[in-house]
A protein has these predicted regions:
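Intrinsically disordered, low-complexity terminal regulatory regions
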Residues: 1-125, 133-143, 156, 165-236, ...
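PAS-family sensory/regulatory modules and their coupling/dimerization elements
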Residues: 147-148, 156-161, 264-317
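Signal-transducing coiled-coil/dimerization helices and immediately adjacent hinge/linker segments
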Residues: 202-260, 323-331, 335-338, 343-344, ...
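N-terminal sensory regulatory modules of PAS/LOV and PAS-like folds
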Residues: 132, 254, 261, 269
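Glycine-centered loop/turn motifs
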Residues: 118-120, 256, 262
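Dynamic helix-loop-helix/coil hinge segments at AAA+ ATPase domain boundaries and subdomain interfaces
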Residues: 314-326
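Short, solvent-exposed loop/turn elements at beta->coil junctions and helix N-caps
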Residues: 147-151, 218
């Protein structure tokens, strides 16, 4: 209790010295600051950046290679979606160890690019309150903007982070976007969350590649989005996997894992299986009376996940080789097209016109 009282007193002193008001600070941020104070961090000194060796980093990357093959294309897409300059995107493991980064030239020369680098550890107990570290602690999306950072050295940075939650409910990584700009904060966080959901969906499909996967949502127009609930069902009609959205939407029912489909929904699995396998969208009701629309996402043994072979490098077309930004944009477009082999699908995925896609692949 004495330690907590001491930390609260020091918290107020720090706010006064930095001309900040506690009532303008969110609860998550203020609690993070108190944890930092209790750890012995001093916001008026430069943080002691902790880096692992290049050999260690290489070994950890190799151990996470299968996961990185799914994550890297998503952070490349996220980077292309964030408008403006001086932005960077990073992927860290579940402990806040940065493994991969993408940033523009302006960011590389600034505070963000020089400090958020592969091999750096951004856990809260090391770097104080920051977006990446706070998502590690809270296991939820976070924004830490400007003076909300515990260390004065980080005051010019805004961070947007979201955890990657695996099919078993465990946090397996963090996606973070950082900049020195304060504009479009909620928009940026929404894009970061979208990237993590897409990663989670791909991991779920990969894990249950031999099962029937059903997508469901209370609104039929959302069935093609990353906000859907996913259920993996075996040949006996038993649920063997459920994603986070499914658990939220079916909260209050039985424990989903290893539960028979018929104990979750009033429509028996055998009565709708034929229509589902024929790609029909059905409206079904759970045992609490809530209705959802459901459609087959994947048939038994029909995994749609394609491993990205990082050894087969995609190069920019001739007209895009004059600047780094042009090259990076072109490589992203060409690699996305090669992955999907469909101009329309690549256009929707990247949010650019089909004409733009066509220019870069011919």
């Amino acid at each position: 209790m004495n330690n907590l009282n001491s930390a609260n007193k020091e918290f107020k002193n720090i706010l006064k010295k930095r001309n900040m008001l506690s009532d303008t600070m969110g609860e998550d941020i203020s609690e993070s600051w108190i944890r930092c104070i209790s750890t012995g961090l001093n916001p008026f000194k430069d943080p002691k950046q902790r880096l692992i060796s290049s050999i260690e980093l290489k070994q950890i990357k190799e151990r996470n290679e299968a996961l990185r093959k799914i994550i890297i294309p998503e952070i490349e897409l996220l980077y292309s979606q964030i408008a403006g300059t001086n932005f960077m995107v990073a992927y860290s493991d579940e402990n806040g160890l940065v493994l991969d980064t993408i940033y523009d030239k302006t960011c590389l020369q600034g505070d963000v690019g020089k400090s958020v680098i592969p091999g750096s550890i951004w856990a809260e107990k090391v770097c104080g309150t920051n977006g990446l570290g706070l998502s590690v602690e809270l296991k939820k999306p976070t924004i830490v903007s400007g003076k909300e950072h515990f260390f004065i050295a980080h005051e010019k940075i805004s961070c947007f982070a979201s955890p990657i939650i695996n099919y078993d409910g465990k946090t397996i990584g963090i996606i973070d976007a950082s900049t020195d700009s304060k504009s479009r904060e909620q928009h940026t966080l929404a894009l970061v969350k979208l990237a993590t959901r897409s990663i989670e969906t791909k991991l779920f499909i990969k894990k249950f590649s031999n099962e029937l996967i059903l997508s469901f949502h209370p609104r039929s127009e959302y069935l093609s989005t990353t906000s859907v609930g996913l259920l993996a069902i075996n040949g006996d009609g038993v649920v063997v996997g459920a994603n986070t959205s499914a658990k939220i939407m079916l909260h209050g029912l039985v424990d989903l894992k290893n539960e028979n489909f018929n104990n979750i929904f009033t429509n028996s699995f055998s009565s709708i299986a034929s229509d589902l396998l024929n790609n029909k969208i059905l409206k079904i009701t759970d045992h609490l009376g809530s209705s959802v629309f459901v459609v087959k996402s994947q048939n038994f043994g029909e995994s749609k996940i394609k491993e990205t072979n990082t050894s087969n490098k995609t190069y920019a077309c001739k007209s895009c080789k004059d600047t780094k930004i042009k090259r990076e944009k072109c490589v992203l477009i060409r690699s996305t097209f090669l992955e999907t082999n469909n101009i329309s699908v690549a256009s929707r995925k990247l949010g650019v016109s089909r004409t733009t896609i066509y220019k870069h692949i011919n």
